[in-house]
Amino acid sequence: MQFIFFGTLFSGLLLVCAVTNDIEDASGETPGIVSQITEEQPHQRQKLYNWDYKDLGTIAFEDIPFPTLQPSQTIDQSENCPEGWIRYSDSCYWVETELLGFAKAERKCSEKQSTLFVANSIDEWEAIRGHSKDSFSSWIGLVRFSHYERSEQLPRWQTEGAVNPSKINWLIKPYSPLVNGWSQLANCAASYKSPASLETASYTYFYPCTYLFYSICERNSTIANSLH
Ligand SMILES: *[C@@H]1O[C@H](CO)[C@@H](O)[C@H](O)[C@H]1NC(C)=O
């Protein structure tokens, strides 16, 4: 009985696939247009970010396509941040509590017109990492790419003007990549927030970028509005 059921289901799936293929074939130009958009879009990202889709395509990352850029509106957060966001200076921050790999976390921020959290001062770093969820690690916008390993000792923040990464709370100080978990397969930095009673036990460490963590997004109005 079960066997027959699965048999029917399977041929049903085959039929669906066949129909879908027919539709795609019939739609002529569409696939061409789609690939054109996905090829152009990373180029626009390069102006703003310290890394782009080519870096994200290395083995330690998931190679996922980015959404098409929305026609962006001017962001005015001089008064308030959107509901659920945290405010610090001219930036708004979103604590993402869906468990995501680094590349998906970055994309999720991008969909909210934000980047992963980049600290422009140690005060900002302390204030914002303190809002991430207790006893969890959260992705931040800090990566040491294997292909820059020879030329760069320090990891790269996602946007310009950030603090010297060696000054933040690495697990092992003074900072060096290897003692803090970095390897060819562990490029992405995450901030671990210890429970409040053990605050000094919070730290930053490198992990494989495919690990599933929380994440912190930052929408810096200066950066967001420099896009247009
Ligand atoms: C926002 O970005 C600008 C330009 O990089 C920077 O000077 C400023 O410190 C940032 N503000 C915050 C709160 O991150």
Swiss-Prot record:
Asked whether the UniProt record includes Glycoprotein among its keywords, one would answer yes
Which cysteines are disulphide-bonded?
Answer: 109-217, 188-209
Q: SUPFAM superfamilies from the entry?
A: C-type lectin-like
Pfam families for this protein:
Lectin_C
One CC-aspect GO term: external side of plasma membrane
Signal sequence, start to end: 1-18
Q: Which residues are glycosylated?
A: 27, 220
Occurrences of domain C-type lectin (ranges): 88-218
- A biological process term (GO) from this entry: immune response
The Swiss-Prot or TrEMBL record annotates one GO molecular function as:
carbohydrate binding
Origin, by domain of life?
Eukaryota
Instruction: Report keywords, A-Z.
Output: Disulfide bond, Glycoprotein, Lectin, Proteoglycan, Signal
For whether the record's keyword set contains DNA damage, the answer is no
Q: What is this protein called?
A: C-type lectin domain-containing protein 88
Q: Which organism is it from?
A: Caenorhabditis elegans
User: Which gene name belongs to this protein?
Assistant: clec-88
